[in-house]
Amino acid sequence: MSNSRSILSQPEWRIVDQSSLGPTFHALQSFAMDDTLCTSIGNGKSAATMRSWVHHNTIVLGIQDSRLPHLEEGISFLKQHNFNVIVRNSGGLAVVLDEGVLNVSLLFQETEKGIDIDLGYDTMWHLIKEMLKDYDVTIEAKEIVGSYCPGSYDLSIRDQKFAGISQRRIRGGVAVQIYLCATGSGSERAALVRDFYNLAIQGEETRFTYPEIVPSTMASLSELLGETITVQDLMMRLLKTLQQFAPKLTPSQLTIDEIPLYETNLQRIIDRNNKALGLEK
């Protein structure tokens, strides 16, 4: 873990906290934010950045999900359950975001200290273990078969997944992103995605193999730790942990120079999302 510690050890972490913006903060804005910050960091115009974010009742689909044979029926089902639906601009499959899920992005220069793909994932895994080290639990990174959006860096306790990590690289910057299920029922979130896939596939043969979701493979941290641990609790732990690695944490929003790039990125992402969902005018 020494290399992941070295990435966390920065002279300064820029902190962009968007965890309490409420239901009007749209998930497409988040992806535009990370693309903008990645570009600034890649250009050497920004320090390494931690961005935290929460979105209310949103299902984030992957590109492969947009090719489901009965996608419209699946989306109608999700909307009936009061969920917004978007397609993200990177790989992976469907995930659930709501008020009980904290999302964290770590963004740093790609060239710095030779960051390969696994090292980016290891850095986030190490951060989460440090945040929760006072609990007597082992946090493993391995694929949890039966979970939604399964991957080799699923984070789990006793084989129940509470977090998933993804990674995006753009213009010399790296964004390592994680969703952390803090409160609520992990199995209920998983059941929602299972039912979405059932409606969107309807037993048809597909070129891509979609996950067969077993809701009991997923849980929230509150369920796994036996006590309520809220998004706000995780935010406090996150900031305290980053303070151990950096002498300076600097609260920030987008700079004047970053705002035009953000607006360009947001429009591009909106257009791509509409195309993926067949919403083009």
From Swiss-Prot:
BPL/LPL catalytic domain residues: 44-250
Active-site positions on this chain: C149 (acyl-thioester intermediate)
InterPro entries linked: aa-tRNA-synth_II/BPL/LPL, BPL_LPL_catalytic, LipL, Octanoyltrans_LipM/LipL
UniProt pathway annotation: Protein modification; protein lipoylation via endogenous pathway; protein N(6)-(lipoyl)lysine from octanoyl-[acyl-carrier-protein]
Gene: lipL
Pfam families found in the cross-reference section: LplA-B_cat
Name of this chain's protein: Octanoyl-[GcvH]:protein N-octanoyltransferase
Enzyme class: transferase
Record-stated family: Belongs to the octanoyltransferase LipL family.
Residues at the site labelled Lowers pKa of active site Cys: K161
Any GO MF annotation of the entry: lipoyl(octanoyl) transferase activity
Residue ranges the record marks as coiled coil: none
Recorded catalytic activity of this chain's protein: N(6)-octanoyl-L-lysyl-[glycine-cleavage complex H protein] + L-lysyl-[lipoyl-carrier protein] = N(6)-octanoyl-L-lysyl-[lipoyl-carrier protein] + L-lysyl-[glycine-cleavage complex H protein]
GO annotation, biological process: lipoate biosynthetic process; protein modification process
Origin superkingdom: Bacteria
Secretion signal span: none
CDD domains noted in UniProt: LplA (cd16443)
Record EC number: 2.3.1.204
Keyword terms: Acyltransferase, Transferase
Miscellaneous note of the record: The reaction proceeds via a thioester-linked acyl-enzyme intermediate.
Protein function: Catalyzes the amidotransfer (transamidation) of the octanoyl moiety from octanoyl-GcvH to the lipoyl domain of the E2 subunit of lipoate-dependent enzymes.
